[in-house]
Structure formats: structure tokens, C-alpha cells
From Swiss-Prot:
Binds 2 Zn(2+) ions per subunit. InterPro entries: Deacylase_DtdA_archaea, DtdA. It is an enzyme of class 3 (hydrolase). The gene is dtdA. This is D-aminoacyl-tRNA deacylase. Keywords: Hydrolase, Metal-binding, Zinc. It comes from Methanococcoides burtonii (strain DSM 6242 / NBRC 107633 / OCM 468 / ACE-M). It catalyses: a D-aminoacyl-tRNA + H2O = a tRNA + a D-alpha-amino acid + H(+); glycyl-tRNA(Ala) + H2O = tRNA(Ala) + glycine + H(+). One of its GO terms (biological process) is D-amino acid catabolic process. Its EC number is 3.1.1.96. Transmembrane segments: none annotated. D-aminoacyl-tRNA deacylase with broad substrate specificity. By recycling D-aminoacyl-tRNA to D-amino acids and free tRNA molecules, this enzyme counteracts the toxicity associated with the formation of D-aminoacyl-tRNA entities in vivo.
Length: 479
């Protein structure tokens, strides 16, 4: 994410563009005028061809035009020429669809393919991901009681020739909703609540126009999205369009709606992401990094992959405060600072055989980052930035694993030798046969500790069990 895409809080000027010919835009404008004290102002003539009015209230401006918003290419330059400050453009508009959904939306503009509704072919506007995040979250919070859905839309229509960060805020999807007073009030309040800030920014690929999974991530995780390309636009995403999306979004990562995309398309997008040095994160990865500084999460992400491991990077809740944005502001971490703890894999396998979820529960109480494979098993590599935490974790995990094993086996850990001795009583089919027990149900009864009768003789469980012992050298290491 770059400062070209998101502006600093101090001195941020927001220009709201409203259209006379758009009923939803007029609805939003009327509520904006009610919510703050505005002063109508004049600007030099000859700059705007379709100017209706200009209002100012603090750091907010309303510019009302007589034409549709989608044809306002270059309006950022006109605003500058008129002597107005503009760090962010918000287009207050209607959303139209045949299904007539009660819907509040936000999206960016541009034309990955042809320019059928304003803008230019193959051109993307400068996106404002944090503003989109603010809008959608404000809309969702304020609209809970009025029956409107909230969604991010994929990139579409004009204007595309905009170098100031911009975003659309819309009411949909029919004449009834466009003039709905509650909807107008909510969108107006959402616009006035927009602030600047920084968060990880993804560019999205796949799925439908309304980007359901991407919308969910904006509303429920720590990231936002820049430009988004649904399935019907993927054909236009070549190297040049991918580069534009990265640059015009300030992208940190790539997200694919994997279930909605073909294998070939996923492979192609992954290759483009590699070419531009961007990570492709899954939904679970994005949700898992909640509360963790993006730069720190990315360090662990790459550490896991540099060691040839796969799966999701998991950060226990108790560790997140130590890896938050505040820590990023204080320390300058990189991958060379990562301390790796390797726990003996046989120990973890043995614990898993006794208690399938035991290791996971221990890790959720721990102070290290770990990797969970796609089959939900845990890698034996664990990570932290602090040597003391690594040493404490090694002691903790070994002690707790032994406690779990003691619930099933007789165990003895010899610290000086770093050896774990494990003893077990096991049913022996061979001994059972020697006592005349045939294979079948009686084997099961004896294995469960129950006696059986053979030709009038009682065969006790202890007669057909044998004691085994094995030693496990714990190959644990910190480096």
C-alpha cells in the first residue's frame, strides 16, 4: 500500500461528486446538506462544462454536476484547476440492477475491457481501498435495521481517467430505493465518517460481480481491496492489466475466489502474482492475520514457505498483542530475526495418536507462530522473534506433550539424556491363540480387558497382554 493511494489524516480534503440527473445522488446530497453546515461557494468559470453548484463544510466539498458521474473523466484535474484541495473523490450515485435488490454498494471504476459506460478501454482509476473499507463498514453498521444488504462491487464503468484516489458510494437497485430516505441518510453518514488510514490491500480475482467473498473479507477482517476482477473480466487480465491493478490499488497481496475459478485461471493469476512479487493468500490466511501487523505476518508467511512447508500461518490470540501494528512502529523486524523451534516429529505424532486435538490446544495457549497443513495437522516448525520465548516454548510443549502421553502410557523422561521412555500393555493375538482363543469376537473382548471362556477355562486379559517399551530420543532444536 502506497501513500499515493491513501492520504494522511492531517489536512485530508474530500470532494463528494453529486449529479443532478441521478435521483439517488440527489437523495444523498440532501442528507449531506442536513448533516453539516455548508456554505455555497463559487469557482472560476470556464473549467467545468456541467457545473451546477459547489458547497464547502470544513474539509468536505460537494461538487454538483449536471451530467452523469460516469462521464467525469479528468474531474480531479478540473478541481485542482479551480483551486480546490482534493485528496479523495467520493461519487454519490445510484446502483441499478434487474433484480431490484435493496442494496448499498461501494466500488472502484475502470474498464478492464471495452469502455461501454464512460471512461477509456483498458484503464483503471486510482483506487482508495481504506475509504472503501470505511464506507462498507459504516453502511453495514447503520443499515442493520432497514433491510438493505451491503456489498462491494467489482471494478466497472467510468470515469477511469482519475489520478486522485476515488470510490463510488451507491444506493440500489431501483427507483424505489434510490429515493429511500433512510438509505440516503445512511450513505451520507457513511461518507462523512470516512477517514484515512492504512491496512493491507488486496487485488481480487474470480467470483461474481458483487464479489461476495471479497465483501465478507472487507467487513470481517483486517484488509481491504483495491481493484477486483470477477470471472467475466478475467479474460482481460494480462501482464499489463495486472500491473495497472497493482499500481492503481497500492496492492500488498492477491486474493482469488478459488472455488469460482478454473484451475487454468488460478494458475495464471498465481504466475502473475509471482512475477510482481505478491503473495496469494487464502481466505483463512487473511482471517488468521487479524490483529497482526501485515509486515510481521508476511515475514512468517515467507519463513514457512522458505523452509518448504505449506499450509496456513497461525498466530495464537495471546501472541497477537506482541505482533500488532504498535510493535511494527517500534521494531524493525525482518526474516533474519526469526527464531525457529523444531520439535521432534515423532513426539507430535505420538501425542496426536492419543489426543488428536491436543497439540492444537497447546499451541493456542502458546507464544509462537505455527503452520497448520491443509489436512489440519500441525508442522513441527514453530517461530518467534525472541530467544527467550523460543526456550520457554520448547520447555512448555515437551512438558505438556508428556502429560498427554501419560494419560495413555507409562512414561519416563530422562532430561540428561533427552530421552522419553514409553511403556505399554498391548493385547497379543499370538498369546491368545496359545491359550486356544480363536480369532474373532473373543479377541475384541480380551483387548477391551474382558475375560472369556474356552472349553470351561477362563482366559484372563492379563494372560494375553504383553508389555512393550520403546525409547524416543527427542530431536528438538532451536536455531
Amino acid at each position: 500500500m502506497t501513500e499515493d493511494n491513501e492520504v494522511q489524516i492531517a489536512g485530508m480534503s474530500i470532494v463528494i461528486v453529486c449529479s443532478v440527473v441521478d435521483p439517488a445522488s440527489q437523495n444523498i446530497k440532501e442528507h449531506l446538506l442536513k448533516l453539516r453546515d455548508w456554505v455555497e461557494m463559487s469557482v472560476p468559470g470556464g473549467i467545468f462544462d456541467d457545473l451546477s453548484a459547489v458547497y464547502q463544510s470544513g474539509n468536505f466539498y460537494i461538487i454538483e454536476v449536471t451530467e452523469h458521474h460516469i462521464y467525469q473523466d479528468g474531474i480531479d484535474r478540473k478541481i485542482e484547476e479551480a483551486g480546490l484541495d482534493c485528496d479523495l473523490l467520493i461519487f454519490a450515485s445510484k446502483h441499478k440492477s434487474a433484480d431490484g435488490r435493496r442494496l448499498l454498494t461501494a466500488h472502484f471504476t475502470g474498464n478492464p475491457g471495452s469502455a461501454d459506460f464512460g471512461g477509456y478501454p483498458g484503464e483503471l482509476s486510482m483506487a482508495a481501498p481504506f475509504a472503501l473499507r470505511c464506507l462498507l463498514r459504516n453502511m453495514a453498521e447503520l443499515s442493520e435495521s432497514i433491510g438493505f444488504d451491503v456489498s462491494m462491487e467489482s471494478t466497472h464503468h467510468g470515469p477511469s481517467d482519475l489520478d486522485v484516489p476515488s470510490v463510488y458510494a451507491e444506493i440500489g437497485s431501483s427507483e424505489v430505493e434510490w429515493v429511500d430516505q433512510d438509505a440516503g441518510d445512511i450513505v451520507a453518514r457513511s461518507i462523512l465518517s470516512v477517514r484515512s488510514g492504512f491496512c493491507p490491500v488486496g487485488i481480487g480475482f474470480g467470483g461474481g460481480h458483487y464479489a461476495a467473498r471479497q465483501s465478507e473479507l472487507v467487513l470481517g477482517s483486517d484488509i481491504s481491496f483495491g481493484h477486483n476482477f470477477p470471472n467475466y473480466q478475467l479474460q482481460f487480465v494480462d501482464v499489463d492489466m495486472f500491473r495497472k491493478a497493482v499500481e492503481r490499488s497500492g496492492a500488498d497481496l492477491v486474493y482469488c475466489d478459488r472455488k469460482a475459478m478454473s484451475s487454468d485461471e488460478k494458475k495464471r493469476i498465481n504466475e502473475l502474482a509471482d512475477e510482481f512479487g505478491l503473495d496469494v493468500l487464502r481466505e483463512s490466511d487473511i482471517k488468521g492475520m487479524e490483529g497482526v501487523c501485515w509486515d510481521i505476518f508476511r515475514i512468517f508467511w515467507h519463513k514457512v514457505r522458505d523452509e518448504g512447508l505449506s499450509g496456513r500461518v497461525k498466530v495464537p490470540v495471546g501472541l497477537k498483542d506482541k505482533l500488532s501494528e504498535n510493535v511494527c512502529d517500534i521494531f524493525d523486524f525482518d526474516v533474519s530475526n526469526v527464531v525457529t523451534v523444531v520439535i521432534d516429529n515423532e513426539l507430535l505424532k505420538l501425542v496426536r495418536s492419543v489426543d488428536a486435538g491436543g497439540v492444537k490446544r497447546l499451541l493456542d495457549m502458546s507464544n509462537v507462530v505455527y503452520s497448520e497443513r491443509d489436512d489440519a495437522t500441525i508442522s513441527n516448525h514453530f517461530y518467534t522473534f525472541w530467544n527467550r520465548d523460543a526456550e520457554d516454548f520448547l520447555t512448555f510443549i515437551v512438558d505438556e506433550c508428556i502429560k498427554i502421553l501419560k494419560g495413555r502410557y507409562d512414561t519416563e523422561y530422562v532430561f540428561e539424556e533427552n530421552v522419553l521412555y514409553i511403556s505399554d500393555e498391548r493385547f497379543s493375538p499370538e498369546l491368545a491363540r496359545k491359550w486356544g482363543v480363536p480369532s474373532g469376537p473373543m479377541f475384541g473382548e480380551l483387548a477391551k480387558g474382558q475375560s472369556v471362556m474356552i472349553e470351561g477355562n477362563t482366559v484372563l486379559p492379563e494372560m494375553v497382554h504383553e508389555r512393550t517399551q520403546k525409547s524416543l530420543v527427542l530431536r528438538n532444536v532451536i536455531f
